[in-house]
Amino acid sequence: MVKVYIENYGCARNRADGEIMAALLYLSGHEIVESPEESEIVVVNSCAVKDPTERKIARRIRELLDNGKKVIVTGCLPHVNPDVIDERVSAILGVKSIDRIVQAVEYAMRGEKLISVPDWKKRNLDKLDFPRLSPRNVYFILPIAEGCLNACTYCATRLARGVLKSYSPEKIIGWVKWAIKQGYKEIWLSAEDTGCYGFDIGTNLAKLIDEITAIEGEFRIRVGMMNPNHVLKFLDELIDAYKDEKVYKFLHLPVQSGDNEILRKMGRMYTVEEFEEIVKAFRREFPELNLHTDIIVGFPGESEEAFQRSVELIKRIRPDKVNVSRYSPRPGTIAAKWKQLPGWVVKERSRLLHRIRLQISYEINRKYIGKKVKVLIHGEGKKGNVDAVTMNYKHIILPEGRKGEFREARVKNAASTYLLGEIIT
């Protein structure tokens, strides 16, 4: 028996991969421990979407090795930039090789090194066929697909995850029923782009949501990020699916830029106007919609005028949250070859947009004060409070509440990133 600690980075999709590896190790007689200090081997389940994250992970790998730990690196980094991985690691597994984790651990304990980073074209895994060792949270992360149909010029994730492979609705429904039976109250539908789910197997996300909401039980669905160009193809159908009370009125719709020429250079395949069309359609039906979007600042060729169009867009649509990212060139991408903007320009634009988005978020959240909201208790938070979410997935801090309960609360105060409330029933 080997004591293994799994350290996950990046998206929910990656965390689900970590849970598969944990289950495979556990079922093979190994022990999954709660901290690296307790472990003999640390699995660093990496992310490579941004350069700062990549550098942080590379430093972490060196730190673990310097402290005498055996390290296995999994996730996207082995595909995107393997050169930054310390050569002292015991094994390197790509995202299509997580089923070899037991072999990697056993090799490592014998002092042998396993490297398996197959191209996505040569090896595919239906990850719903594998067991999961999931934390006893209120929510269950459920991957519905891997890969995407886009070819964004800045994104390296496609290099690792490949082209879209949707999982069958039957298997997804089976996992939802299992999760509800286990006591989970919240299902996260996760993918690189949930908006293109099913396009390769003759179905779509709206139909999948309809099948899930037909399942008996009190639970909620949180739909993950979707790209606008795919949503446009079935917008009315998706909005109809969202009308079910089991679906959180939460929409993560990344726009990435408010300038159409920059969107064209990014390879995003939609316009600012089309993005706004989707937002308006959702808000007409769901005035309480919690809208999240993403903006990349400092993309190659982004002029001051182009950046200001992004600022104007955010001021105009007023999202509940904007994830602001500074562009960083990723190995193997087209945009990495283009002339880059000075770092100080990118930093300045990021700071400006960040201030604007915090102010907008604060103003939106203040409007909730005094309102009665239904909440799902997620569990213990900081300072003796509990964390919960509203039915449009606003985070709310409460003084009491039992994990997994649906309760009624009243909002008493607000900050940019959360609400404060009290239980009333």
Curated annotation (Swiss-Prot):
Protein task: Catalyzes the methylthiolation of N6-threonylcarbamoyladenosine (t(6)A), leading to the formation of 2-methylthio-N6-threonylcarbamoyladenosine (ms(2)t(6)A) at position 37 in tRNAs that read codons beginning with adenine.
Family: Belongs to the methylthiotransferase family. CDKAL1 subfamily.
UniProt cofactor(s): [4Fe-4S] cluster
Family annotation (NCBIfam families): MiaB-like-B, MiaB/RimO family radical SAM methylthiotransferase
UniProt name for this protein: Probable threonylcarbamoyladenosine tRNA methylthiotransferase
Pfam families named in the record: Radical_SAM, TRAM, UPF0004
Disulphide connectivity of cysteines: none
Residues that, per the record, bind [4Fe-4S] cluster 1: C11, C47, C76
Positions with a binding annotation for [4Fe-4S] cluster 2: C148, C152, C155
Location of the TRAM domain: 366-425
UniProt cofactor note: Binds 2 [4Fe-4S] clusters. One cluster is coordinated with 3 cysteines and an exchangeable S-adenosyl-L-methionine.
Alphabetical list of Gene3D superfamilies matching this protein: Methylthiotransferase, N-terminal domain, tm_1862 like domain
Record's keyword terms, sorted: 4Fe-4S, Iron, Iron-sulfur, Metal-binding, S-adenosyl-L-methionine, Transferase, tRNA processing
GO function terms (MF aspect): 4 iron, 4 sulfur cluster binding; metal ion binding; N6-threonylcarbomyladenosine methylthiotransferase activity; tRNA (N(6)-L-threonylcarbamoyladenosine(37)-C(2))-methylthiotransferase
Limits of the MTTase N-terminal domain: 2-110
Catalytic activity: N(6)-L-threonylcarbamoyladenosine(37) in tRNA + (sulfur carrier)-SH + AH2 + 2 S-adenosyl-L-methionine = 2-methylsulfanyl-N(6)-L-threonylcarbamoyladenosine(37) in tRNA + (sulfur carrier)-H + 5'-deoxyadenosine + L-methionine + A + S-adenosyl-L-homocysteine + 2 H(+)
Every Radical SAM core domain range: 134-363
Catalytic activity, EC: 2.8.4.5
